């Protein structure tokens, strides 16, 4: 269980002489961790994430910055390809806040990672809990709990349609002689009209190993 930041939940441990989490923003830190976990026969690495900063204490972000309390924090998804290339069996569970991610683009990103990892990617679904994150995304504050989860249901319904319903099994032929990469009869337009999201289009990726991560 880790996070693309200094220390994760072990606040202050980064000052210990033997701690190397200050190197979180180097590729080697993550590929070395992935290889170590695989040698130790771990099944997977779960990476947390937040959108926003802790700014409630004394109405300030100062302590958060001084102690590096999950700030700075980098994007977890961008670590996966490198760690997958350095391992063969380790799985990757990545946290993504669907409140601020367009579902159409997110569906493509996860399908891409499922291809590149050969089916070793998973998604930890969250809706956010920080007012600071909501305000940074242009909102007045954090949306009410029930509304966030209603939006999440609509989001999931949409991405499941893209992953499971746009490309049939057997749609991809890769027939060089016939000059047919994909059979148009087996690729379908997805139409979604939900309370929060609307979509009219095709999933941009051919089916990945898991389809739905």
What does each model-identified segment do?
Residues 1-213:
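N-terminal glycine-rich cofactor-binding segment that shapes the pocket for flavin-like pterin cofactors
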């Amino acid at each position: 269980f880790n996070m693309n930041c200094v220390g994760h939940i072990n606040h202050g441990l980064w000052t210990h002489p033997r701690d190397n989490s200050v190197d979180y923003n180097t590729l080697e830190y993550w590929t070395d961790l992935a290889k170590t976990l695989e040698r130790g026969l771990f099944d997977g690495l779960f990476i947390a994430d937040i959108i926003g900063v802790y700014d409630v204490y004394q109405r300030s972000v100062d302590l958060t910055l001084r102690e590096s309390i999950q700030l700075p924090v980098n994007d977890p998804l961008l670590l996966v390809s490198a760690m997958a290339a350095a391992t063969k069996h380790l799985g990757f569970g990545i946290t993504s806040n669907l409140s601020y991610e367009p579902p159409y683009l997110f569906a493509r990103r996860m399908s891409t990672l499922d291809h590149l990892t050969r089916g070793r990617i998973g998604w930890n679904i969250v809706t956010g809990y920080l007012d600071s994150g909501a305000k940074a995304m242009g909102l007045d504050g954090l949306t009410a709990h029930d509304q966030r989860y209603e939006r999440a249901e609509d989001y999931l319904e949409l991405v499941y349609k893209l992953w499971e319903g746009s490309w049939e099994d057997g749609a991809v032929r890769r027939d060089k002689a016939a000059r047919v990469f994909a059979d148009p009869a087996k690729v379908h337009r997805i139409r979604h009209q939900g309370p929060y999201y609307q979509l009219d289009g095709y999933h941009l990726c051919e089916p990945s190993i898991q389809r739905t991560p």
